[in-house]
């Protein structure tokens, strides 16, 4: 709870109505439904709700689908053949719920009277291209963004992105790409504030202070504030502690690891792969902070159990 308060509850990202904070509850809520699917009844409803959250989360923040996929993969790999009939039943509910959720959300979106120009879409190749740039170590690069937006059609944009991707991979080579990946990982994982106040022209407008409370919080959260460095040190320490505790999961023996733990670890591995492929931003981890904290606690408990058995 302390880590959650420090990294999520007190994080200024909570106050930003953007996809990261909006989708914050989805991965942990999906994990809750998965870990409690066999308790308290209503299993079919829980599976349907899980499927709906997976589709909704993907549409808000694609990274949330990683935990969704992890649950599916673990469930399939560790399937019990003696329960094959029930498995087919629940899998059918799962797939049907996905289809219903997808089309229902699609109908809702199409009825909002907002016309979307598909030719202005920035697709996945753009973010792969940006993730390979060596100027910002895989982070946001205005030149890449401007180049992609200069094309009038999605087809032209994708073709240019793919050409640049191939060029950058060729320039790096295997060793160069590995070095780039190390730098990119630091960009993504080495900031407990999750890149607060570090993106573009961060403050569009700063209003005049009207109260002492306002001044108090500005001193904490604004990078020019007198207490901002203290805030950064505290959350950075909390974040690094979680990462260290998460690494302690290596002390958990395979026979002592249940599917719940497997889902958590696989989802975080999947998140790492996702961030390694696409544009690097520390903020993109924010939605998974609750999962990181749970993983850290599991790792700490596993390490303590390992120490007791020595």
Stretches found by the model and what they are:
Residues 46-62, 72-73, 93-98:
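Membrane-interface alpha helices of multi-pass inner-membrane proteins
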Residues 110-211:
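Membrane-proximal stem/loop segments at transmembrane-domain junctions that anchor or position
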Residues 187-264, 268:
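Membrane-interface anchor segments at the N-terminal boundary of transmembrane helices
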Residues 39-45, 79-91, 245-265:
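Membrane-interface helix-loop-helix junctions at transmembrane boundaries of multi-pass membrane enzymes
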Residues 28-49, 76:
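Membrane-interface transmembrane helices that cradle and orient dolichyl/undecaprenyl
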Residues 1-6, 258-262:
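Transmembrane-helix signature of polytopic, membrane-embedded enzymes
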Residues 2-29, 34, 60-67, 284-289:
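Multi-pass, polyprenyl lipid-linked donor-dependent membrane glycosyltransferases
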Residues 67-99:
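Perimembrane helix-loop-helix junctions
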């Amino acid at each position: 709870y302390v880590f959650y308060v420090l990294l999520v509850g007190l994080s200024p990202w909570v106050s930003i109505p953007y996809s990261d904070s909006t989708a914050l509850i989805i991965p942990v809520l999906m994990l809750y439904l998965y870990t409690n699917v066999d308790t308290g009844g209503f299993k079919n409803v829980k599976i349907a709700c899980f499927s709906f959250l997976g589709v909704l989360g993907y549409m808000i923040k694609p990274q949330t689908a990683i935990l969704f996929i992890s649950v599916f993969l673990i469930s399939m790999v560790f399937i019990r053949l003696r329960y094959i009939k029930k498995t087919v039943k629940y899998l059918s509910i799962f797939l049907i719920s996905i289809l219903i959720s997808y089309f229902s959300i699609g109908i809702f979106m199409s009825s909002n009277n907002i016309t979307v120009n598909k030719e202005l879409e920035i697709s996945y190749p753009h973010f792969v291209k940006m993730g390979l740039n060596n100027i910002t170590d895989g982070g946001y690069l205005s030149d890449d963004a401007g180049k992609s937006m200069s094309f009038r059609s999605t087809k032209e944009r994708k073709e240019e992105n793919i050409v640049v991707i191939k060029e950058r991979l060729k320039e790096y080579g295997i060793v160069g790409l590995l070095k780039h990946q190390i730098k990119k990982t630091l960009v993504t994982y080495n900031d407990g504030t999750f890149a607060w106040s570090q993106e573009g022209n961060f403050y569009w407008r700063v209003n005049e202070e009207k109260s002492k409370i306002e001044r108090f919080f500005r001193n904490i959260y604004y990078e020019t504030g007198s207490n901002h460095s203290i805030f950064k040190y505290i959350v950075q320490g909390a974040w690094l502690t979680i990462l260290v505790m998460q690494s302690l999961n290596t002390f958990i023996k395979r026979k002592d690891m249940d599917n719940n733990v497997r889902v958590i670890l696989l989802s975080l591995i999947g998140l790492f792969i996702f961030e390694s492929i696409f544009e690097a931003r520390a903020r993109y981890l924010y939605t998974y902070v609750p999962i990181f904290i749970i993983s850290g606690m599991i790792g700490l408990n596993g390490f303590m159990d390992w120490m007791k058995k020595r």
